[in-house]
Amino acid sequence: MFDLEYQLKNLPDKPGVYLMKNNLGEIIYVGKAKILKNRVRQYFQKSQKHSEKVKAMVKNIEEFEYIITDSEIEALILECNLIKKYRPKYNILLKDDKHYPFIKVTLAEDFPRVVSTRKVTKDGSKYFGPYVDGSSVKDIIELIKKTFPIRTCKKNIVEGAKAIRPCLNYQIGLCKAPCAQYIKKSEYREIIDDVIKLLSGKHLDIVENFKLNMEKAAENLEFEKAAMLRDKINIIEKIGEKQKIILNNFDNEDYISLYSDGKDTCFQVFFLRNGKIVGREHFIIEDTFDTNSSTLISNFLKEFYGGTAYIPKTIYVPNIEDEALLEQWLTLKKESKSTIKIPIKGEKKNILVLVEKNAKTTLENFKLKYLQEKALYDNVLKDLKNILRLQEEPIRIEAFDISNIQGFDSVGSMVVFEKGRAKPSDYRRFKINTVKGADDYKSMKEILTRRFQHGLSEIKSIQDRKLEFSSGKFSVFPDLILMDGGKGQINIALEVLNTFNIDIPVCGMVKDNKHRTRGLIYNGEEIIINKYGSVMKFITRVQDEVHRFAISYHRSLRGKNSFHSLLDDIPNIGEKRKKDLLFNFKSIDNIKKATYEELLSIPSMDKKSAECVLEFFK
């Protein structure tokens, strides 16, 4: 039994991290403290300063634990790692750990390439970004390849190495063929320097140089060359237009601001690289209530830069708490100096004001769209409740489907809709194990049995404190089960539910002679629904989604099986050995006939793997 008063009295006066837990033992909040004793006790003292969110959290705290660290910066690092691991309910959580795309110039290579990456490492390469839009990165790289004759292959090409035959890109003028040693390292580097200038925003210099060459070509009556240079100038200017200059400096900076409407908050981030805005991103955090903006920004920075691949030299914010500590943490992560600044006036301040205005507009537009959708879905669920005469609105609906082609690789799928919206994180796939051939009823019985068997097992583990509620994959049960078939599938579902003593409403579909849904069947009664109404549109959406999900899984399995080789079934034969065997022996028949000595002559094969091949084909 957790003695709260005793634990509060015996808290240490040292830095560390504390973890708040609910009555299920689930971690609902992670925080760091300079002095654990002072910080943790504050939560349990009656205070008007507590925000509504903190008050709600404290009501749910059943117990807590703490971890002592040597310093506050260690506590901050540990806090970030634990938040990422447990995703606690009351911490500010971004929807995902975004690793934005960068353009990477591989300068450590003799003949560098220009590629896209989401990881920034100290490997001697030059990185440009981040870009919020991945397709924008792809477009820019494609335009660069059309303009500059640089290599795109992954070969390890070194100056002075043995020349190899150049590929098609050389024949069509898209590469200078360093692989064939047709260009010196220094000459190739001049081309790469132009690429770097372009990505650094100095495209006007390149355009000027290309224009001079174009005019010279025209004077020499080399009209084809002049036309080619004209096209390249257009491409370079197109790349330049993709990035808007807003500052005259060439630093890498992020501008972060927020707008709160009393309940929710929108954070907006502008990414400036070399004085140009290369992208912006927004994050909407619900239920922030009256938490002050400096706390919100501090928490946001920890979450955002804890996940992103790149930390800029300078971060501008309107206000923040723990500024010095966060600077220290960012510098450690970046492995070079990173500074947080609060501009008071001037162009930096003006940019932050612009960022805040964008945050306000984004939040207002989001809420308008959200409220419109919520009203629509609320009405659909109310209508569905009334049509089926349910006791409660079906907040969570699960739909199931079976997919097979002539009994091949039968699979089942489960899709989930909560409050009228699809919830892909709760979708589940089932490979049918116990049914041979195409038997939809038996297959459906198997997947429903597995779904609720797993669910009951997880609920018991949660009750026994062996599993956290948030870690359960099947522990949340639906308010309504929607079957794509009629009475037969409904009876299968009810049979499974009765086996487990579970009471959940189950309805099926009524189809017309063209196999189009015209209504629902529930408790043995057919209910015809207006085909133009919102309920029918919703049911159709659920049907389409469960079909799509089942078919996509089935296709993926068929794709895997179509590439299956007999060699995949031999112990100790992996992908490398399989490729080597096929390369050397050309066919499975030749491998079957191979002797022990012939198998061992292949470098990747050893005695054990050779014996396995001989044993398999014996």
Curated annotation (Swiss-Prot):
Stored Gene3D superfamilies: 5' to 3' exonuclease, C-terminal subdomain, GIY-YIG endonuclease, UVR domain, UvrC, RNAse H endonuclease domain
GO molecular function, one term: excinuclease ABC activity
Domain GIY-YIG per the UniProt entry, residue ranges: 13-92
Positions of disulphide bridges: none
Domain of life: Bacteria
Pfam families assigned to the protein according to its UniProt record, in alphabetical order: GIY-YIG, HHH_2, UVR, UvrC_RNaseH, UvrC_RNaseH_dom
Record InterPro entries: DisA/LigA_HHH, GIY-YIG_endonuc, GIY-YIG_endonuc_sf, GIY-YIG_UvrC_Cho, RuvA_2-like, UVR_dom, UVR_dom_sf, UvrABC_protein_C
Domain spans labelled UVR: 204-239
Protein's GO biological process: nucleotide-excision repair; SOS response
One GO cellular component term noted in the UniProt record for this chain: cytoplasm
Keywords in alphabetical order: Cytoplasm, DNA damage, DNA excision, DNA repair, Excision nuclease, SOS response
Subcellular location: Cytoplasm
Quaternary organization: Interacts with UvrB in an incision complex.
Entry function: The UvrABC repair system catalyzes the recognition and processing of DNA lesions. UvrC both incises the 5' and 3' sides of the lesion. The N-terminal half is responsible for the 3' incision and the C-terminal half is responsible for the 5' incision.
Similarity comment text for this entry: Belongs to the UvrC family.
The name this protein goes by in its record: UvrABC system protein C
Organism, as annotated: Clostridium botulinum (strain Kyoto / Type A2)
Gene symbol of the encoding locus: uvrC
